[in-house]
Amino acid sequence: MAWVSFYLLPFIFSTGLCALPVLTQPPSASALLGASIKLTCTLSSEHSTYTIEWYQQRPGRSPQYIMKVKSDGSHSKGDGIPDRFMGSSSGADRYLTFSNLQSDDEAEYHCGESHTIDGQVG
């Protein structure tokens, strides 16, 4: 029985002069190979309509864009991201769900605020 570990680190990137949101994530998670796992990124309540972006970072590599997740739960994936990666939303929470976990999914996962509110850049 093999486990896959995930390390979660929120970060913020923004180009506007608006107050910055606070993003929180649990520090780590793990699951069995072949299982599913849901990672959570929580926005501060006053920024609950913001869009976030999920990134995967393996040791010694640059972050790889996975997807954007909007407040309505819709998501758009980066090039080459498999169908087993899904995004969703509930209130101020944005989720990244993996199904059929594979050993190469073990990495750090970052969520970042993309400074998009209801489809408009702020």
From Swiss-Prot:
<dbReference type="InterPro" id="IPR036179">
    <property type="entry name" value="Ig-like_dom_sf"/>
</dbReference>
<keyword id="KW-0393">Immunoglobulin domain</keyword>
<comment type="subunit">
    <text>Immunoglobulins are composed of two identical heavy chains and two identical light chains; disulfide-linked.</text>
</comment>
<dbReference type="InterPro" id="IPR007110">
    <property type="entry name" value="Ig-like_dom"/>
</dbReference>
<dbReference type="GO" id="GO:0002250">
    <property type="term" value="P:adaptive immune response"/>
</dbReference>
<dbReference type="InterPro" id="IPR003599">
    <property type="entry name" value="Ig_sub"/>
</dbReference>
<keyword id="KW-0732">Signal</keyword>
<keyword id="KW-0964">Secreted</keyword>
<dbReference type="InterPro" id="IPR013783">
    <property type="entry name" value="Ig-like_fold"/>
</dbReference>
<keyword id="KW-0391">Immunity</keyword>
<feature type="signal peptide">
    <location>
        <begin position="1"/>
        <end position="19"/>
    </location>
</feature>
<feature type="region of interest" description="Framework-3">
    <location>
        <begin position="76"/>
        <end position="111"/>
    </location>
</feature>
<dbReference type="GO" id="GO:0019814">
    <property type="term" value="C:immunoglobulin complex"/>
</dbReference>
<feature type="region of interest" description="Complementarity-determining-3">
    <location>
        <begin position="112"/>
        <end position="122"/>
    </location>
</feature>
<dbReference type="GO" id="GO:0006955">
    <property type="term" value="P:immune response"/>
</dbReference>
<protein>
    <recommendedName>
        <fullName>Immunoglobulin lambda variable 4-3</fullName>
    </recommendedName>
</protein>
<dbReference type="GO" id="GO:0005576">
    <property type="term" value="C:extracellular region"/>
</dbReference>
<dbReference type="InterPro" id="IPR050150">
    <property type="entry name" value="IgV_Light_Chain"/>
</dbReference>
<keyword id="KW-1003">Cell membrane</keyword>
<dbReference type="GO" id="GO:0005886">
    <property type="term" value="C:plasma membrane"/>
</dbReference>
<keyword id="KW-0472">Membrane</keyword>
<feature type="region of interest" description="Framework-1">
    <location>
        <begin position="20"/>
        <end position="44"/>
    </location>
</feature>
<keyword id="KW-1280">Immunoglobulin</keyword>
<feature type="region of interest" description="Complementarity-determining-1">
    <location>
        <begin position="45"/>
        <end position="51"/>
    </location>
</feature>
<dbReference type="Pfam" id="PF07686">
    <property type="entry name" value="V-set"/>
</dbReference>
<feature type="disulfide bond">
    <location>
        <begin position="41"/>
        <end position="111"/>
    </location>
</feature>
<keyword id="KW-1064">Adaptive immunity</keyword>
<dbReference type="InterPro" id="IPR013106">
    <property type="entry name" value="Ig_V-set"/>
</dbReference>
<comment type="function">
    <text>V region of the variable domain of immunoglobulin light chains that participates in the antigen recognition. Immunoglobulins, also known as antibodies, are membrane-bound or secreted glycoproteins produced by B lymphocytes. In the recognition phase of humoral immunity, the membrane-bound immunoglobulins serve as receptors which, upon binding of a specific antigen, trigger the clonal expansion and differentiation of B lymphocytes into immunoglobulins-secreting plasma cells.</text>
</comment>
<feature type="region of interest" description="Complementarity-determining-2">
    <location>
        <begin position="69"/>
        <end position="75"/>
    </location>
</feature>
<feature type="region of interest" description="Framework-2">
    <location>
        <begin position="52"/>
        <end position="68"/>
    </location>
</feature>
<feature type="domain" description="Ig-like">
    <location>
        <begin position="21"/>
        <end position="122"/>
    </location>
</feature>
<keyword id="KW-1015">Disulfide bond</keyword>
